From Swiss-Prot:
Superkingdom, natural source: Bacteria
Pfam family, one: Ribosomal_L33
The keyword Ribosomal protein appears for this protein: yes
Name of the featured protein: Large ribosomal subunit protein bL33B
Cross-referenced InterPro entries: Ribosomal_bL33, Ribosomal_bL33_CS, Ribosomal_bL33_sf, Ribosomal_zn-bd
Keyword Flavoprotein applies: no
GO-annotated cellular components: cytoplasm; ribonucleoprotein complex; ribosome
SUPFAM superfamilies attached to this UniProt entry: Zn-binding ribosomal proteins
GO MF annotation terms: structural constituent of ribosome
Keywords: Ribonucleoprotein, Ribosomal protein
Gene name as annotated: rpmG2
Protein family per UniProt: Belongs to the bacterial ribosomal protein bL33 family.
Provenance organism: Salinispora tropica (strain ATCC BAA-916 / DSM 44818 / JCM 13857 / NBRC 105044 / CNB-440)
HAMAP family cross-referenced by the UniProt entry: Ribosomal_bL33
GO biological process terms held by the UniProt record: translation
Length: 55
């Protein structure tokens, strides 16, 4: 199992507009301590939207 203090934890990215959780990725906590936002394709919307890290 992963440690709670893992440097590269798994995070889930959810679409800001439709709230669907579309992507799972990893991030480096030292470089990005805040929640990350990426512009990715949302299959439900059919276009690129902002996806924000969920907890």
């Amino acid at each position: 199992m992963a440690k709670a203090t893992d440097v590269r934890p798994k995070i889930t990215l959810a679409c800001v507009e439709c709230k669907e959780r579309n992507y799972i990725t990893r991030k480096n906590r030292r470089n990005d301590p805040d929640r990350i936002e990426l512009k990715k394709f949302c299959p439900r919307e059919g276009r690129h939207t902002i996806h924000r890290e969920t907890r």
